[in-house]
Protein backbone atom coordinates (compact mmCIF):
# COMPACT_ATOMS: atom_id res chain seq x y z
CA UNK A 1 0.00 0.00 0.00
CA UNK A 2 1.44 3.36 -1.04
CA UNK A 3 1.93 5.95 1.70
CA UNK A 4 0.54 9.45 1.24
CA UNK A 5 0.63 12.59 3.37
CA UNK A 6 -2.56 14.65 3.23
CA UNK A 7 -2.50 18.20 4.55
CA UNK A 8 -5.73 18.26 6.49
CA UNK A 9 -7.13 21.49 7.91
CA UNK A 10 -10.46 20.14 9.13
CA UNK A 11 -12.35 22.05 6.43
CA UNK A 12 -14.59 20.51 3.78
CA UNK A 13 -12.08 20.60 0.91
CA UNK A 14 -9.28 18.75 2.69
CA UNK A 15 -11.88 16.52 4.40
CA UNK A 16 -13.05 15.39 0.98
CA UNK A 17 -9.47 14.95 -0.26
CA UNK A 18 -8.59 12.92 2.84
CA UNK A 19 -11.54 10.59 2.36
CA UNK A 20 -10.81 10.32 -1.36
CA UNK A 21 -7.27 9.18 -0.58
CA UNK A 22 -8.50 6.62 1.94
CA UNK A 23 -11.10 5.25 -0.47
CA UNK A 24 -8.50 5.02 -3.24
CA UNK A 25 -6.48 2.69 -1.06
CA UNK A 26 -3.59 4.88 0.04
CA UNK A 27 -1.94 4.41 3.42
CA UNK A 28 -2.84 7.93 4.56
CA UNK A 29 -0.99 10.06 7.09
CA UNK A 30 -2.78 13.31 7.93
CA UNK A 31 -0.90 16.46 8.85
CA UNK A 32 -2.55 19.55 10.33
CA UNK A 33 -1.06 22.88 11.36
CA UNK A 34 -1.76 25.36 14.11
CA UNK A 35 -0.27 28.47 12.53
CA UNK A 36 -2.08 30.92 14.79
CA UNK A 37 -5.29 30.96 12.77
CA UNK A 38 -8.35 32.42 14.49
CA UNK A 39 -10.33 29.41 13.33
CA UNK A 40 -8.11 26.79 14.98
CA UNK A 41 -11.35 25.13 16.03
CA UNK A 42 -10.97 23.30 12.72
CA UNK A 43 -8.18 21.23 14.25
CA UNK A 44 -10.61 19.60 16.69
CA UNK A 45 -12.73 18.50 13.74
CA UNK A 46 -9.62 17.19 11.98
CA UNK A 47 -8.60 15.13 14.99
CA UNK A 48 -12.07 13.64 15.41
CA UNK A 49 -12.28 12.59 11.76
CA UNK A 50 -8.83 11.00 11.82
CA UNK A 51 -9.76 9.08 14.95
CA UNK A 52 -12.89 7.76 13.20
CA UNK A 53 -10.97 6.78 10.08
CA UNK A 54 -8.07 5.35 12.08
CA UNK A 55 -5.71 7.60 10.12
CA UNK A 56 -2.42 8.58 11.81
CA UNK A 57 -2.62 12.30 12.50
CA UNK A 58 -0.12 14.93 13.59
CA UNK A 59 -0.98 18.51 14.55
CA UNK A 60 2.12 20.65 14.20
CA UNK A 61 2.32 23.73 16.41
CA UNK A 62 3.85 26.56 14.38
CA UNK A 63 1.87 29.41 15.96
CA UNK A 64 4.99 31.54 16.29
CA UNK A 65 5.04 32.17 12.53
CA UNK A 66 1.88 34.26 12.90
CA UNK A 67 4.08 37.10 14.20
CA UNK A 68 5.48 37.37 10.67
CA UNK A 69 2.07 37.80 9.04
CA UNK A 70 0.50 40.85 10.68
CA UNK A 71 -1.20 41.82 7.40
CA UNK A 72 -3.48 38.76 7.38
CA UNK A 73 -6.93 38.91 8.95
CA UNK A 74 -6.79 35.16 9.57
CA UNK A 75 -4.07 35.53 12.20
CA UNK A 76 -3.95 39.20 13.23
CA UNK A 77 -6.10 40.33 16.15
CA UNK A 78 -5.92 43.86 14.74
CA UNK A 79 -7.74 43.02 11.49
CA UNK A 80 -11.31 41.77 11.27
CA UNK A 81 -12.09 38.87 8.97
CA UNK A 82 -14.07 40.47 6.11
CA UNK A 83 -17.57 39.48 5.08
CA UNK A 84 -18.55 38.83 1.49
CA UNK A 85 -17.65 36.71 -1.50
CA UNK A 86 -14.13 35.67 -2.47
CA UNK A 87 -14.41 37.78 -5.62
CA UNK A 88 -14.41 40.97 -3.51
CA UNK A 89 -11.13 42.87 -3.22
CA UNK A 90 -11.30 42.99 0.58
CA UNK A 91 -10.92 39.20 0.69
CA UNK A 92 -7.21 39.61 -0.03
CA UNK A 93 -6.76 40.35 3.67
CA UNK A 94 -7.39 36.64 4.30
CA UNK A 95 -4.17 35.74 2.49
CA UNK A 96 -1.49 34.38 4.82
CA UNK A 97 1.70 35.15 2.87
CA UNK A 98 3.41 32.06 1.49
CA UNK A 99 1.27 29.80 3.70
CA UNK A 100 0.91 26.85 1.39
CA UNK A 101 4.57 26.85 0.41
CA UNK A 102 5.47 26.70 4.11
CA UNK A 103 2.95 23.99 4.96
CA UNK A 104 3.69 21.89 1.88
CA UNK A 105 7.44 22.12 2.54
CA UNK A 106 6.92 20.72 6.02
CA UNK A 107 4.63 18.02 4.64
CA UNK A 108 7.26 17.06 2.07
CA UNK A 109 9.83 16.67 4.84
CA UNK A 110 7.40 14.45 6.74
CA UNK A 111 6.73 12.43 3.60
CA UNK A 112 10.45 11.83 3.09
CA UNK A 113 10.81 10.73 6.70
CA UNK A 114 8.01 8.15 6.56
CA UNK A 115 8.86 7.12 2.98
CA UNK A 116 5.59 8.40 1.51
CA UNK A 117 5.42 8.93 -2.23
CA UNK A 118 3.37 12.12 -2.29
CA UNK A 119 1.65 15.04 -0.60
CA UNK A 120 -1.95 16.05 -1.28
CA UNK A 121 -3.59 19.33 -0.33
CA UNK A 122 -7.04 20.79 -0.83
CA UNK A 123 -6.54 23.65 -3.30
CA UNK A 124 -9.42 24.10 -5.75
CA UNK A 125 -10.43 26.40 -8.59
CA UNK A 126 -12.49 28.66 -6.33
CA UNK A 127 -9.25 29.63 -4.57
CA UNK A 128 -7.38 30.69 -7.70
CA UNK A 129 -8.52 34.32 -7.75
CA UNK A 130 -7.49 35.25 -4.21
CA UNK A 131 -4.83 32.71 -3.25
CA UNK A 132 -1.79 32.50 -5.58
CA UNK A 133 -0.52 29.40 -3.77
CA UNK A 134 -3.62 27.48 -4.84
CA UNK A 135 -3.14 28.06 -8.57
CA UNK A 136 -2.06 25.41 -11.10
CA UNK A 137 1.25 27.13 -11.82
CA UNK A 138 2.14 27.03 -8.11
CA UNK A 139 1.27 23.35 -7.76
CA UNK A 140 3.34 22.57 -10.85
CA UNK A 141 6.51 24.29 -9.66
CA UNK A 142 6.09 23.06 -6.08
CA UNK A 143 5.89 19.52 -7.42
CA UNK A 144 9.01 20.12 -9.49
CA UNK A 145 10.92 21.61 -6.55
CA UNK A 146 9.91 18.75 -4.28
CA UNK A 147 11.29 16.19 -6.69
CA UNK A 148 14.75 17.79 -6.69
CA UNK A 149 14.92 19.03 -3.08
CA UNK A 150 15.57 15.60 -1.59
CA UNK A 151 17.22 12.33 -2.55
CA UNK A 152 13.76 10.79 -2.30
CA UNK A 153 11.39 12.40 -4.85
CA UNK A 154 7.97 13.29 -3.42
CA UNK A 155 5.19 14.49 -5.69
CA UNK A 156 2.80 17.32 -4.77
CA UNK A 157 -0.80 17.02 -5.92
CA UNK A 158 -4.08 18.89 -5.43
CA UNK A 159 -6.82 16.41 -6.44
CA UNK A 160 -9.45 19.14 -6.79
CA UNK A 161 -7.25 21.76 -8.42
CA UNK A 162 -9.55 22.14 -11.43
CA UNK A 163 -12.79 21.67 -9.48
CA UNK A 164 -14.73 24.27 -7.50
CA UNK A 165 -16.32 23.75 -4.09
CA UNK A 166 -19.60 22.79 -5.75
CA UNK A 167 -17.83 19.93 -7.51
CA UNK A 168 -15.93 18.94 -4.38
CA UNK A 169 -19.18 18.65 -2.45
CA UNK A 170 -20.74 16.70 -5.30
CA UNK A 171 -17.88 14.21 -5.14
CA UNK A 172 -18.19 14.00 -1.37
CA UNK A 173 -21.91 13.31 -1.61
CA UNK A 174 -21.14 10.41 -3.97
CA UNK A 175 -18.75 9.08 -1.33
CA UNK A 176 -21.47 9.39 1.31
CA UNK A 177 -19.53 11.88 3.44
CA UNK A 178 -20.99 13.68 6.46
CA UNK A 179 -20.08 17.36 6.28
CA UNK A 180 -21.23 18.03 9.84
CA UNK A 181 -17.75 16.72 10.64
CA UNK A 182 -16.10 19.76 9.03
CA UNK A 183 -15.42 23.35 10.07
CA UNK A 184 -15.21 26.01 7.38
CA UNK A 185 -15.82 29.40 9.04
CA UNK A 186 -12.87 31.77 9.41
CA UNK A 187 -14.28 33.21 12.63
CA UNK A 188 -13.87 30.13 14.82
CA UNK A 189 -16.75 30.98 17.14
CA UNK A 190 -19.37 28.62 18.58
CA UNK A 191 -21.42 28.75 15.38
CA UNK A 192 -20.29 29.44 11.83
CA UNK A 193 -20.88 33.09 10.91
CA UNK A 194 -22.39 32.46 7.47
CA UNK A 195 -21.00 35.74 6.14
CA UNK A 196 -17.22 35.35 5.73
CA UNK A 197 -15.93 34.37 2.30
CA UNK A 198 -15.37 30.78 3.35
CA UNK A 199 -18.91 30.39 4.71
CA UNK A 200 -20.47 32.10 1.69
CA UNK A 201 -18.70 29.76 -0.72
CA UNK A 202 -19.69 26.74 1.36
CA UNK A 203 -23.35 27.77 1.49
CA UNK A 204 -23.35 28.33 -2.27
CA UNK A 205 -21.98 24.82 -2.78
CA UNK A 206 -24.73 23.23 -0.70
CA UNK A 207 -27.38 25.30 -2.45
CA UNK A 208 -26.05 24.33 -5.88
CA UNK A 209 -26.17 20.66 -4.88
CA UNK A 210 -29.73 21.05 -3.56
CA UNK A 211 -28.97 19.78 -0.07
CA UNK A 212 -29.02 21.37 3.36
CA UNK A 213 -25.79 22.26 5.11
CA UNK A 214 -25.70 20.29 8.40
CA UNK A 215 -23.62 22.98 10.11
CA UNK A 216 -25.36 25.57 12.31
CA UNK A 217 -24.96 29.24 11.42
CA UNK A 218 -25.43 32.34 13.52
CA UNK A 219 -27.28 34.19 10.73
Swiss-Prot record:
Pathway assigned in UniProt: Purine metabolism; 7-cyano-7-deazaguanine biosynthesis
UniProt keyword Nucleotidyltransferase, yes or no: no
Enzyme nomenclature, EC number: 6.3.4.20
Keywords for this protein: ATP-binding, Ligase, Metal-binding, Nucleotide-binding, Queuosine biosynthesis, Zinc
Catalytic activity: 7-carboxy-7-deazaguanine + NH4(+) + ATP = 7-cyano-7-deazaguanine + ADP + phosphate + H2O + H(+)
Residue sites binding ATP per the record: 8-18
GO molecular function, one term: zinc ion binding
Xref: Gene3D superfamilies: HUPs
Binding site for Zn(2+): 185, 193, 196, 199
Cofactor: Zn(2+)
Pfam families given in the database record: QueC
Biological processes, Gene Ontology terms: queuosine biosynthetic process
InterPro entries: QueC, Rossmann-like_a/b/a_fold
Cofactor note: Binds 1 zinc ion per subunit.
SUPFAM superfamilies hit by this protein: Adenine nucleotide alpha hydrolases-like
Family: Belongs to the QueC family.
Functional summary from the UniProt entry: Catalyzes the ATP-dependent conversion of 7-carboxy-7-deazaguanine (CDG) to 7-cyano-7-deazaguanine (preQ(0)).
HAMAP family: QueC
Name listed for the protein in its UniProt record: 7-cyano-7-deazaguanine synthase 2
Originating species: Colwellia psychrerythraea (strain 34H / ATCC BAA-681)
Origin organism lineage: Bacteria, Pseudomonadati, Pseudomonadota, Gammaproteobacteria, Alteromonadales
Amino acid sequence: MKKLVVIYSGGMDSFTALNKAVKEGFDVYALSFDYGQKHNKELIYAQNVCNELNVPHKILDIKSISTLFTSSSLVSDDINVPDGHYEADNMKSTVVPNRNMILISLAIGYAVDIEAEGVWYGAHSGDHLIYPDCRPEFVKVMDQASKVANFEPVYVHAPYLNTDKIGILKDGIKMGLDYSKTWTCYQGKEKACGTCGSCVERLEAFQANNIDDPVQYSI
